[in-house]
Amino acid sequence: MQDLSPHPGDLDPIETASTDELRALQLERLSWTLEHAYRNVPHYRAAFDAAGVRPEDLETLDDLARFPFTAKSDLRENYPFGMFAVPRDQVVRVHASSGTTGRPTVVGYPRDDLDVWATVVARSIRAAGGRAGDILHNAYGYGLFTGGLGAHYGAEKLGCLVVPVSGGQTERQVQLIQDFQPDIIMVTPSYMLSIIDEMERQGIDPRSTSLKVGIFGAEPWTNDMRREMEARLDMHAVDIYGLSEVIGPGVASECVETKDGLTVWEDHFYPEIVDPVTMQPVPDGEEGELVFTSLTKQAMPIIRYRTRDLTRLLPGTARSMRRIEKITGRTDDMIILRGVNLFPTQIEELILQTPALAPHFQCVLTRPGQLDELTVLVEPREGAVDTASDAAERLRHLIKDRIGVTVVVDVRAPGEVERSAGKARRLVDERPKR
C-alpha cells in the first residue's frame, strides 16, 4: 500500500494548534452556541430553565456538564422544524433520518452550515489520504440520508473528481470502478464486502483495482474487518464517523498515517463521554456513551446530544485534537443474554477469526420458551462449503469462551444472509412484543 500521509503544510492550522489555543476557541464558540440556542429555540429555553441553568453560567468547559442532554426523542417531538434556530427561509436544505422506528429526525442547513459540513468532510478525506485531483467513487446513498451528499460536497471542496454512483446496482459499481479507475471509494463497510464479492464472482482480482483508500462509515466495523478488506483490496481502510443530528459524516475521521482512532474535529464539535447509567462525565480514557455539542452550527445547534455510541476519548496523535476509539457498539443494540452484555461487533471479530466463514452475518434474537435465544446466521467462504459445519462449531465455542454465552450458529448457503447497499442490519429482534 502507498504512503498517503498528508504533507504538514496541507493541514489546517487548527489541526496542529496547542491544547490551550483549541480550548480557548472551544469555550468562545460554546458560549455563542448556548446563547444562540437559548434565545432562538423554545425547546432549549425550556430545558435550560427546567435545569436551572443559563448560557452565562458557562465559565469553563467543565461547566457544560450542568446543561441538559438532548435526545433523538426531543428532535422527533419538535418535528419537523421546531429545533431550527434561524428563520425557515434561511434554510436551503434539509436531511432526515429514515424514521423506521418513528418520525424522522429532521436537520436543516443554511449555506454557512453547508460550508462547514463540506469543510470537515474535506478535512476527513484528506486525513484518510485523499488529495485534490483524486477520483472518488461515492457509493453512499443519496437523498435524505446525509452520507451521499455529505461525501459528495466534501470531496468537491477538497478538489476531487466525484463519481456520484450512490448505493445499489453492485454489478454497475464494479464496472464503473474498472472503467473510471478511482483512487478513493466511500461506502459502508458491509456494502464494500458485497462489492468485493461481486468482483470475485466476475473473476476480477480486487487487489488489481486502482483503489488506494476506502473511507468506510455509517456503521460500526472492527479492526479485524480492516485487516480483511486491506488484505483483499491492497488499499488503506479508514474509518469516518458522523451522524445527521450533529451534522452528518465528517464529525471525526481516522488519519491514514496512524489508523489508531478517529480524530474529532474539535473546532466544530465538542465531545464528552458519560456513564450511560449515571449520565455523569467520565475521565478521558474510560469507556462510555459519546455525547456531542456543536460549536459552529447556525440553523440547528445541538446541545449535549446523546449518540448512544460507546467509545473512549483518547489524546491526539497525528493531530493535536483528541481521538475517539473505534465505536464498539451502541447502547441500543446491546444484547443482554443470560446476564451477559454483548454487541454484534464482538460476534464480527470472532467470525473474522474463523477462516472458513465469510464476513457476512446477522444476529437474530428469539424467545422460543421462557428464555431468550441468540442465533448467528453465517455463510461459508467460497470453496469452504464442506468445512462450514466444523467452522460453525468452532465459532460457537469461540463465542462461549470469549464472550461467555451459548448461541446457535446457523450456516446458510452463500448469498442467503441479508445484504444491504447501506447500513447492514446486524441485529434482528424477533421476540414477541409484550
Residue ranges and their predicted role:
Residues 1-96, 101-119, 123-127, 370-377, ...:
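Nucleotide 5′-phosphate-binding alpha/beta core
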Residues 1-16, 67-238, 246, 250-261, ...:
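Active-site phosphate/ATP/adenylate-binding loop shared across adenylate-forming ligases
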Residues 162, 237, 271, 361-363, ...:
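Generic structural signal for residues in well-ordered beta-strands
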Residues 165, 240-242, 274, 366, ...:
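Conserved beta-strand termini and adjacent loop/short-helix elements that scaffold enzyme active sites
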Residues 185, 291, 295-403, 422:
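AMP-binding/adenylate-forming catalytic core of the ANL superfamily
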Residues 209, 265-268, 330:
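Short, solvent-exposed loop/turn segments at the edges of secondary structure
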Residues 221-316:
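Conserved AMP-binding/adenylate-forming
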